[in-house]
């Protein structure tokens, strides 16, 4: 489901809610670099020249974690490659000035903690204290096989015949079956949690058929409630909705599908109501899980018509955190926005990307950042991205099929792999075969990826790892075009148009995907024909 940022977010990036700030200045150590706080680098289709990547630069604009999650996961955590970290249970604002990290908080003066000498040392110390592993993970199928989301192909036209056809097309095109996500909108109203029988004549039979084909079925949802629905009347009466600022009346909040009321997830009765609706869907139709969308911080910011009031003084981050706590109760789940849910049994997804080479370049950096704030179970968005306009009225003479191939290859050796646009619709046979091979590679590696996920439930370490995390002090501080899959595989996908790239190998010996051994500690040039995803297995 497409997330649309609003114009005032640019203002939010420099705006602070804190009326009585306590300011901390963390002076830089020699060659120190800082990472963390956010998964995303920018909102969808931000020009690449305007994007700052991690590690942060010596001078960075102030960003307020209370109002801005950049459309993705966020955490009150910053970590450095010199073994230092910053954590605060409450959201704070931060900026960089001439290399110094400046922290702003209304709760307490924030100090840096030193525990080790490397990025990994800093992460492990913070993780063990503040977001230790839960011992649980999303269902194994989410890692073992590709996922299929109906957003791009069906958008707002989700219905039973089209959904069943997509499932059949997966099989007839020899793609592995896996998780199947029905997207927006399958009910009559937002906040209504039953199938629209005008579009779904027999939902139980549909789910049964998808199960028989080898799929598990998830449904999309948000905390929003249509204000003209019967659910709104009930929820308002039972004090389950976010209220308008300084009143006891339900607020109407602007989001990408208009104006709606919103469940107040800090209210136990609201969470209980939603939980009951979801478990009823499971009991009635055999639904396996849910895609939890929205809960972005800006819906509840100073510029929105909510908080504070006599009823509640909660915040956007708290709403997102509570949404995640509910989602963790379901074996199959997916989240895009989140707060302080590190190492919980949540499948996180990168925010929607556009279909361009510039947007492709964000996948690896965002996945690396997700790992560094405690999200090992992450999906790198939909293959090709999640923008409808990129796949409507396609001119097949000019459509860039190479980009679709490289997008699929990037995901093949990541924790999760998700299709939405049907590759058999937009690709010729040559390019479709290569994308199919990428899906089959993910399935082939599925058991190994699942073992990494199981390991993360115990040790809390990322699955997709920054090279600086894995190989400190070897010059990888700013390396964001390649990544480690666990401890064993270095993956170096193509991120721009062409058929050659450089790969910087850490010290040691490495066996590449073609069977050739390389001595590390140097940069090599490699050929990357269209059907190749370069990866290197660590030897010894």
Model-derived regions, located:
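Bacterial Sec-dependent N-terminal signal peptides
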Residues: 1-21
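Catalytic and substrate-binding clefts that recognize carbohydrates or anionic sugar/phosphate headgroups
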Residues: 19-142, 160-172, 470-471, 525-539
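Aromatic- and carboxylate-enriched substrate-binding clefts and catalytic-loop regions
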Residues: 52-55, 176-436, 468-471, 486
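Generic recognition of flexible, low-complexity loop/linker segments
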Residues: 64-66, 73-75, 135-137, 168-170, ...
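Extracellular structured ligand-interaction cores
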Residues: 72-76, 81-84, 91, 145, ...
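Short, glycine-/Ser/Thr-/acidic-enriched flexible segments
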Residues: 84, 91-93, 153, 187, ...
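N-terminal small/glycine-rich loop or linker at the start of catalytic domains
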Residues: 138-153, 249-262
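Carbohydrate-binding surfaces of carbohydrate-active enzymes
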Residues: 169, 173-174, 209-216, 325-326, ...
């Amino acid at each position: 489901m497409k997330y649309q940022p609003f114009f005032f977010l640019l203002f939010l990036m420099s705006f602070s809610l804190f009326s009585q700030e306590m300011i901390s200045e963390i002076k830089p150590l020699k060659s120190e670099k800082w990472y963390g706080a956010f998964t995303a680098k920018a909102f969808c289709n931000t020009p690449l020249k305007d994007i700052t990547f991690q590690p942060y630069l010596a001078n960075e604009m102030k960003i307020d974690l209370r109002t801005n999650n950049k459309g993705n996961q966020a955490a009150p955590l910053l970590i450095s490659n010199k073994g230092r970290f910053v954590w605060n249970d409450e959201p704070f604002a931060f900026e960089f000035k001439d290399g110094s990290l400046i922290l702003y908080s209304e709760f307490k003066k924030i100090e840096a903690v030193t525990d080790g000498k490397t990025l990994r040392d800093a992460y492990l110390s913070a993780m063990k204290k503040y977001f230790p592993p839960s011992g649980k993970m999303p269902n194994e199928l989410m890692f073992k096989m590709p996922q299929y989301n109906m957003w791009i192909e069906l958008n707002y036209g989700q219905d039973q015949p089209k959904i069943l056809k997509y499932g059949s097309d997966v099989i007839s095109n020899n793609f592995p079956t896996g998780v199947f996500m029905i997207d927006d909108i399958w009910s009559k109203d937002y906040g209504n949690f039953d199938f629209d029988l005008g579009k779904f004549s027999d939902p139980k039979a549909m789910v049964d058929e998808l199960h028989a084909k080898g799929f598990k079925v998830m449904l999309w949802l948000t905390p929003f409630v249509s204000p003209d629905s019967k659910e709104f009347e009930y929820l308002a009466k039972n004090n389950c909705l976010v209220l308008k600022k300084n009143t006891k009346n339900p607020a109407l909040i602007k989001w990408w599908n208009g104006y709606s009321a919103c469940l107040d997830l800090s209210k136990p009765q609201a969470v209980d109501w939603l939980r009951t609706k979801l478990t009823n869907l499971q009991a009635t139709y055999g639904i396996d899980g849910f895609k939890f969308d929205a809960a972005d911080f800006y819906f509840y910011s100073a510029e929105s018509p909510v908080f504070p009031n006599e009823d509640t003084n909660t915040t956007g981050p708290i709403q997102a955190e509570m949404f995640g706590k509910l989602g963790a109760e379901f074996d199959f789940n997916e989240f895009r926005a989140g707060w302080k849910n590190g190492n919980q049994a949540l499948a996180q997804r990168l925010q929607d990307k556009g279909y361009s080479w510039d947007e492709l370049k964000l996948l690896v950096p965002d996945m690396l950042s997700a790992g560094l704030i405690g999200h090992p179970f992450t999906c790198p968005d939909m293959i090709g991205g999640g923008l409808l306009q990129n796949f409507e009225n396609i001119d097949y003479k000019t459509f860039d099929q190479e980009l679709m191939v490289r997008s699929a290859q990037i995901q093949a050796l990541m924790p999760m792999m998700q299709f939405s646009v049907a590759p058999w619709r937009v690709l010729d046979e040559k390019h479709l075969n290569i994308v199919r091979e990428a899906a089959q590679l993910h399935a082939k590696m599925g058991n190994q990826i699942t073992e990494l996920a199981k390991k993360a439930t115990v040790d809390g370490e990322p699955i997709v790892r920054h090279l600086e995390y894995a190989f400190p002090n070897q010059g990888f501080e700013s390396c964001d075009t390649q990544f480690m899959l666990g401890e064993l595989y270095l993956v170096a996908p193509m991120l721009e148009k062409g058929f050659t790239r450089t790969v910087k190998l850490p010290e040691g010996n490495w066996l590449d995907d073609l069977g050739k051994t390389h001595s590390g500690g140097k940069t090599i040039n490699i050929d990357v024909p269209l059907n190749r995803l370069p990866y290197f297995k660590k030897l010894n």
